[in-house]
């Protein structure tokens, strides 16, 4: 009996010592290699990998205390990937809380109004913090990856600034931009004026992309939309240069010639009636709004005045 009591006493003492040692370790300040240390946690990293990374960097004395702490708090899978800037005095428990809250440094990328998909792919490919997973994928494969129902990639991504953590894939960002565009497009489609000669939201997107390339003047968008709507209603050709330029692709040298306007191709709105088969650029929210809420006008023509604005008329005189 005395031996058993002694054994229990020893076990209790060891347990108390271990608890005390563990408490001391998780509340003691970690050691940063530099005054400000950037910790990069890659997407998909598990607790063991993160703990080993911290231990290898000399930030924590042992990976096991960090693992036990996270499991004890039931936060084994709660640490968020990203780039973290560690400064000042942090304990292991404070570090865990910091990583769980996901206060990671955000990277950003901008998609600009009027851009083509080729320009989007270029900036995605050149961004050092983005994993370029679309390399080698066809347009159709990209559409499949992002869950798009469209058959062409042009114009379906919303122009905006997108924030992301280092290591995010270009496909993830494209999917966000696609869903954002769909949300905006559906919202404005549901509020469109009646009797528009546009049968689907996608046709509205096509028209909006043309409006985007025709003017940079906010005050002209609705009026230009009104002209195009009038021409569509009357069965007139749109006769808009930006669609021809888009159809020429790399053949366009900056100078649009008469022969270009006469040469038939699927984006030549001088030779073909109706809308082109796809959008030609990323339309802004203002252009989408104009396409679905055009100005009430009798105008059928407009010409640039040279100051970024346009002059409208009912005839060519």
Name what the model sees in each region.
Residues 1-14:
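N-terminal Sec-pathway targeting helices
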Residues 18-185:
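Signal peptide-directed extracytoplasmic domains
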Residues 11-12, 74, 152, 257:
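Alpha-helical interaction segments
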Residues 46, 121-122, 126-134, 144-317:
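Bacterial extracytoplasmic/cell-wall-associated proteins, especially those involved in peptidoglycan
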